[in-house]
Swiss-Prot record:
Originating organism: Baumannia cicadellinicola subsp. Homalodisca coagulata
The keyword Zinc belongs to this UniProt entry's keyword annotation: no
Any one biological process term the GO annotation gives: rRNA processing
Family: Belongs to the RimM family.
GO molecular function: ribosome binding
Listed Pfam families: PRC_RimM (PF24986), RimM (PF01782)
Name assigned to this protein: Ribosome maturation factor RimM
Summary of subunit composition and partner proteins: Binds ribosomal protein uS19.
InterPro entries given in the database record: PRC_barrel-like_sf, PRC_RimM, RimM, RimM_N, RimM_N_sf, Transl_B-barrel_sf
Methyltransferase in keyword set: no
């Protein structure tokens, strides 16, 4: 059972009749999900260790896996919509200024003038830079529910303090 669980993907559905499963990887390079072992699945409030027998790309170039002891479609369907989970200790240590999204979600966002903007609830990958989705605090609630703030370190993001869960930004609260 993972001490600090991190979702790296999801099992979407059964594939074929021999117990294979379609998966969706949340890692930047889809096949990188296989570098993190062991996998865990939480099913009916019980943690299960996943023993991966094999993985490959199907003819649609989508990832499929074969889990030990799943031999038919009916057994595979029981795992549909389960998250693929690893322990955070398996993730590589990042260099200064790089952050895992999981660590940013839940942080409070405030301006360099200490104005409370809200809490990070999601991040969006846009290609040029990531964007924080910030649930606006009550001061904004009559006008805006969510703020989209680009995660551009130095220009917009001035400081990330994971110990206090505060992200300081140079951002106009009225924008």
């Amino acid at each position: 059972m993972p001490v600090n669980p991190v979702v790296l993907g999801t099992i979407s559905s059964a594939y074929g009749i021999s117990g294979w499963l379609n998966i969706i990887s949340f890692t930047q390079n889809a096949a990188s999900i296989f570098e993190y072992q062991p996998w865990f699945i939480k099913k009916l409030n019980t943690w299960l260790d996943v023993i991966l027998d094999e993985w490959k790309y199907n003819y649609h170039n989508k990832l499929i896996i074969k889990i030990n002891s799943i031999e038919n479609r009916e057994a595979a369907q029981l795992f549909a919509n389960c998250n693929i989970i690893v322990d955070a200790s398996q993730l590589p240590t990042l260099s200064d200024g790089d952050y895992y999204w999981k660590d940013l979600i839940g942080c409070q966002v405030e301006t360099i003038n200490s104005y409370q903007l809200g809490k990070v609830i999601d991040l969006i990958e846009t290609g040029s830079n990531d964007v924080m989705v910030v649930q606006a605090n009550q001061q904004h609630s009559t006008k805006i529910n969510e703020l989209l703030i680009p995660f551009i370190y130095g220009q917009v993001i001035k400081n990330v303090d994971l110990a206090t869960h505060i992200i300081k930004v140079d951002w106009d609260p009225e924008f």
